[in-house]
Design a protein with these regions (language model features):
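Reductase modules of NAD(P)H-dependent flavoproteins
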Residues: 3, 8-110
């Protein structure tokens, strides 16, 4: 599942590339665009932490992660990464460390 969150729909770049990858990996790549400052009929609206916390993100992906089979990779705005990490911890997921396997890893990209 690729979750691509931006402020406005104009920032949803790489649409052609993502569509080609979805075609190539038919049924193996789910793409979920999210905008935080606009409302669109076929795009989730809000911030990733809130959408994860209230279940709308998982519902859109048609996946319900569990601690045995799920791994999250977070990359982006440091505030989003921090807030999403906090939600994952509150949901019982653990940070992946070299010395102990966890459920998520992250990097800040700005």
């Amino acid at each position: 599942v690729l979750v691509h969150a931006v402020r406005t729909s104009q920032e949803l770049v790489y649409q052609e590339l993502i569509a080609n990858l979805q075609q190539e990996y038919r049924g193996k790549l789910t793409y979920i665009p999210i905008v935080s400052r606009e409302k669109h009929q076929h795009i989730l609206s809000g911030r990733i932490p809130a959408l994860l916390r209230d279940g709308r993100l998982m519902q859109a992906a048609n996946l319900f992660p569990d601690k045995h089979n799920s791994f999250f990779y977070l990359c982006g705005n440091p505030a989003m990464v921090h807030d999403t990490r906090d939600v994952l911890l509150a949901l019982g997921f653990a940070k992946h460390l070299r010395r102990s396997k966890g459920h998520f890893s992250f990097e800040n990209y700005w």
